[in-house]
Amino acid sequence: QFELTLLDWAEAHKGARQYVAFADKCWPAFPEQFGFEPCYVNSRLASRGIPVACEVDIYGALSEYIGACISEDAVTLLDINNSVPAAMFEKAIKGKFDYELTDTFMGFHCGNTPSCKMCADRAVKYQLIQNRLLENGGTPDITRGTLEGDIAPGEITFYRLQCDSDGVLRSYIAQGEVLPVPTCSFGGIGVFAIKEMGRFYRHVLIEKRYPHHGAVAFGHY
């Protein structure tokens, strides 16, 4: 019903425009009001070429839309600020791939990545953190609705368009890959690697005051 409502709303409000994108409000308000998480529906829309950004990230939605146009494929939006554990790097990455620990990070979001960009064991589950916050860690009810699993390995392009506090549009773009390394975690998640990511994170993402969301196109563009 939620998916059909969004599609109907888009059709009714796009006017003469051909394409649409959404920037939805999700946690914590959505599950408490509607009784489920919107992530899986968001992933289905993204699979259809209708990008959906989490947490009312308008420029994230615009970034996704740009990637969808360029790649002519499904895209996603992920947190870019989660580290790969040193023990995981030592065990599964070091010596097997040409990356340093600081080149790697966990690309993560609750469960909005299209199923076509995830590994075969993906499944609809529940949001672990919100279950702890909203349901005291009990049997999941209103926190169900995430699409969880590891993101499929392959080439990616990470990018974002953003307006700064002076009203100036800025952007970044970086090419890398999702490594074939099990994350052993929850959500829609993957072990990402971008050469010199540590320097890029410090001197571009932080110094230029970019948000922690990055759009992902699957391939090098």
Feature-to-residue mapping (PLM):
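Anaerobic metallocofactor- and corrinoid-dependent redox/one-carbon enzyme cores
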Residues: 2-221
